[in-house]
Amino acid sequence: MSHGGPCRPGRDLLVLTSNIGRLSRSLQQKPKSGSDQAGRHLSALLRQYPGHPYKKWQGAHWRLLSLVELGVVRADPTMIRALNQVLDWLLDPARPVSRIAGRYRMHASQEGNALLVCCRLGLGGDPRVSELASRLAEWQWSDGGWNCDPRPEVTHSSFHESLAPLRGLVAQGTFSDAATRAADFFLRHRLYRSESGDLVIDREWLRLHWPAYWH
């Protein structure tokens, strides 16, 4: 969600949180008939779509993340099936691990989002979930973040690739050192500024968004 025109934090935040909160409360209940708006949202997010779990925006990865960000905290059988699809994909032994110039160049936001979803839905004790957290800690760069850029000359972590792992590690709770280092990465940038020049990295980041995706 992006607002056009000048940013008005107070008004925008009130409208944004009100709308999200209303939908979140509705999503905690099973839709009665599917005719109400919340029921249609829930039905759409729980529907099984063909294709890869990461397919934008119908894949299980994205639908589960939306449900969790809307406040759903209990996984029904449909959500469990979708979670298993995501975990099977991420933990597939044949999935390549990219390491270039001494740094892991992985799309760590994928594991980070999955870790957050699993922990919010009560699957934090699943060994597969622990493996996701362990991999994120192993792939973390020395500056505290992550980056999927394959170019050897890139040595600075990406904001986009680092926020999801931070959220997931905080939710999982057993890799506090990695989570602290990731938090420090964002704090050094004062959340949205260049570490080297103190400039705003992207002025779009000064606007309120939901969902907080970069696409």
Q: Residue locations for each model-derived region?
A:
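Preference for long, amphipathic alpha-helical scaffolds in soluble/luminal domains
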Residues: 1-215
